[in-house]
């Protein structure tokens, strides 16, 4: 019985990781020069969109889940724009792409969307529930502080460990 449960768990995890696995396979397999004359970053965007459309079309993801994943993509893209900005320069996307905005290729948001897809899929497949959730105002406040720290840690200090302690504390 334990082996069967372990196998079921593994299959659900694999299923939850479907978008992540396919997208990162593309990241590793698409050559730096791109495919069929399409620059690499643009090819990655096409692959990510194709995977996402296929998952919705086959019913592996719902339209409501797609909306949440799009939110992860938008937030992630905004974070990438900040981290690659002229004042920060944490990293860069040096290769050419037709689908760059503010120096950031649109595919980059799918790295965050992949995490969102996994969370949403795992939540549904494992029928997860949160018990003893803190009041929404507390959750909202800690989320705002975490994002504020992300943007301001270069100027006022890094408070991520204090924020983690607050988020995990009782």
Model-inferred region functions:
Residues 1-170:
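Aromatic-rich, lipid-facing transmembrane alpha helices and their immediate juxtamembrane interface loops
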């Amino acid at each position: 019985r334990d082996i069967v449960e372990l196998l079921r768990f593994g299959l659900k995890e694999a299923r939850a990781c479907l978008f992540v696995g396919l997208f990162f396979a593309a990241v590793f397999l698409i050559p730096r020069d791109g495919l069929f004359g399409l620059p690499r970053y643009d090819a990655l965007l096409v692959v990510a969109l194709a995977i996402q459309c296929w998952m919705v079309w086959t019913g592996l993801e719902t339209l409501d889940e797609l909306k949440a994943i799009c939110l992860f993509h938008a937030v992630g893209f905004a974070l990438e724009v900040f981290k690659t900005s002229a004042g920060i320069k944490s990293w860069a996307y040096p290769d050419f792409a037709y689908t760059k905005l503010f120096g950031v290729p649109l595919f980059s948001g799918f790295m965050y969307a992949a995490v969102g897809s996994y969370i949403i899929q795992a939540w549904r497949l494992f029928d997860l529930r949160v018990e003893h959730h803190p009041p929404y105002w507390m959750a909202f406040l800690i989320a705002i502080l975490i994002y504020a720290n992300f943007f301001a840690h270069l100027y006022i200090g890094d408070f991520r460990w204090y924020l983690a302690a607050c988020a995990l504390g009782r």
